[in-house]
Regions:
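PEST-like, low-complexity acidic/proline-rich intrinsically disordered segments
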Residues: 1-12
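Serine residues within intrinsically disordered or low-complexity segments
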Residues: 2-4, 18-21
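Conserved alpha-helical scaffold segments that buttress catalytic/binding sites
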Residues: 10-13, 24-379
Length: 379
C-alpha cells in the first residue's frame, strides 16, 4: 500500500514561481473539490491524528465510532459474520488508535444480534430471511445513529452488504437532525454489484443485493418487520448516489439505473483506452463533482470491488476488478474532500478463498482500505 502524499494536493496561497518551471498550474476539478491544506493547524487532529484534512461536517472528527457487525443473513454463505473479529485480530483497532490517533468508541465487542433472528423466517416477496435482516438493520441504524448524532466519524465493519440498509439509514437520519434538515448525505457505493434489485427483480432473493432499492425508496413495505421501519428521515436521493467499480449488474438493475438517471462508473469507465482515458483519478473527479463539494459523504465499500487477485475471500468475487492501489486511492480521495462522515467495509469472508493465504490477503486489503479512508498518509 502506498497512500498519496499530502504534498500532492494544493496548499493555500500562490504557488512559488520560477523562470525555469514548466509545471502546468491551471486548476483541475480535483483542485476545486479537495479542501485546501492551510499552514495553520486544522480544527481538530485527535490525539495524534495524522490527517491534515479539516472536516467540514464532524464536530468531533478525532472521535471514531466503531460498529462491528457479525451478520451474514443477507446472503447464503457462512463466514462473512467472522470478518469483524478477523479485522480486529489483524490489529486494525490498534492501527486506528495508535497510528492514526483516533479516540475509539463502541469497539469492545462484535455484535451478533442473535436475539433478533427468528427461528422461523419464511420468504416474503421472494426475500430470504426478511425478518432477520429487517430487525438487524434497524438495530444497526440505531447504533450508527447514536455515534453520528454526536458528530463522530462512524466506521462499520461487516458482515454482508445488507447491513448498509442500517448504516446508511442511521447516518442519513443523524445528518438531517444535526443540520436541521439543511443537509442530506450522498453515498459512494464501491462494488462489483449494484445491489439495487427490488424484491421483484431479484433472481436470488438475497437481501444483500437489495439495500440501495430500500434506501432510495424504490422498494418499500408498510410492515415494520419487512423494512417498514425505514422512514423518509432514513432515505437517500437517487441523485446523491454514485457507483464505482461495477462489472456484474443484473438486467433489472440496469433498467433501474437507466430509468432513475443514477450515476454509475463501471470498470469500463476506469479502463478506457489512453486516447479517451478516464482512469480512477478522473472517475473520482467526476464522482465527487456529481455529489458536490458541500455534501456529507457516506462511503460504502464492498471488498468484492477489488479484483480477486487482491481480495479472494469474499462471497461473490468477480474477475476484472479494481487493484488494491485503485481501491486505496478511492478511499484517499474521499478522505481528502473533508466531507466523509461514515465508512462501511463489507463482504470480507475469512472462511472462503482458493488458497491458504487468501483470507489473510483479503483482511489485509480491508485494513488498507479503512486506513486510507481514515486519513493514513506517508508523511
Amino acid at each position: 500500500m502506498s497512500p498519496s502524499l499530502i504534498d500532492n494536493y494544493p496548499t493555500a496561497g500562490p504557488a512559488p514561481t520560477s523562470s525555469t518551471s514548466t509545471k502546468d498550474t491551471r486548476p483541475t476539478i480535483a483542485d476545486q473539490l479537495i479542501p485546501t491544506v492551510r499552514p495553520s493547524p486544522p480544527r481538530y487532529f485527535g490525539n495524534m491524528n495524522t490527517s491534515l484534512v479539516e472536516s467540514k461536517f464532524l464536530t468531533h472528527p478525532g472521535d471514531l465510532g466503531i460498529v462491528a457487525v457479525g451478520f451474514s443473513g443477507g446472503q447464503g454463505k457462512p463466514g462473512v459474520d467472522a470478518a469483524p473479529a478477523a479485522l480486529f485480530e489483524s490489529g486494525l483497532l490498534d492501527q486506528l488508535r495508535h497510528d492514526l490517533g483516533y479516540n475509539l468508541h463502541g469497539h469492545d465487542a462484535v455484535h451478533e444480534y442473535a436475539d433478533l433472528v427468528p427461528q422461523h423466517d419464511p420468504p416474503h416477496r421472494g426475500m430470504k430471511n426478511p425478518r432477520a435482516v429487517s430487525a438487524v438493520t434497524k438495530r444497526i441504524a440505531e447504533q450508527v445513529y447514536a455515534h453520528a448524532r454526536e458528530g463522530r466519524l462512524v466506521l462499520t465493519l461487516g458482515g454482508d452488504h445488507s447491513i448498509a440498509i442500517g448504516t446508511i439509514a442511521g447516518t442519513a437520519k443523524a445528518v438531517r437532525e444535526r443540520f436541521a434538515g439543511r443537509k442530506e448525505i450522498a453515498v459512494i457505493w464501491v462494488d462489483a454489484h449494484a445491489d439495487i434489485n427490488t424484491p421483484e427483480t431479484s433472481g436470488s432473493g438475497n437481501v444483500h443485493g437489495m439495500p440501495v432499492s430500500f434506501l432510495t425508496g424504490l422498494a418499500r413495505d408498510s410492515d415494520e418487520q419487512f423494512f417498514g421501519w425505514i422512514g423518509d428521515e432514513h432515505r437517500i436521493s437517487v441523485s446523491k448516489i454514485v457507483y464505482i467499480g461495477l462489472r456484474d449488474v443484473d438486467p433489472g438493475e440496469k433498467r433501474i439505473l437507466r430509468e432513475n438517471g443514477i450515476k454509475a462508473f463501471s470498470m469500463f469507465d476506469i479502463d478506457r483506452v489512453p486516447i479517451r482515458s478516464y482512469g480512477i483519478g478522473r472517475v473520482m473527479e467526476l464522482a465527487l463533482a456529481h455529489i458536490g463539494a458541500d455534501t456529507p459523504i457516506h462511503l460504502s465499500f464492498d471488498v468484492d470491488a477489488l479484483d480477486p487477485m487482491w481480495a479472494p475471500s469474499t462471497g461473490t468475487p468477480v474477475r476484472g476488478g479494481l487493484t488494491l492501489r485503485e481501491g486505496d486511492f478511492i478511499c484517499e480521495m474521499v478522505h481528502q474532500t473533508g466531507s466523509l462522515v461514515a465508512v462501511d467495509l463489507v463482504e470480507v469472508n475469512p472462511r472462503l478463498g482458493p488458497a491458504v493465504d487468501a483470507a489473510h490477503d483479503t483482511v489485509r486489503a480491508g485494513c488498507s482500505l479503512v486506513r486510507c479512508a481514515l486519513g493514513e498518509t506517508l508523511l
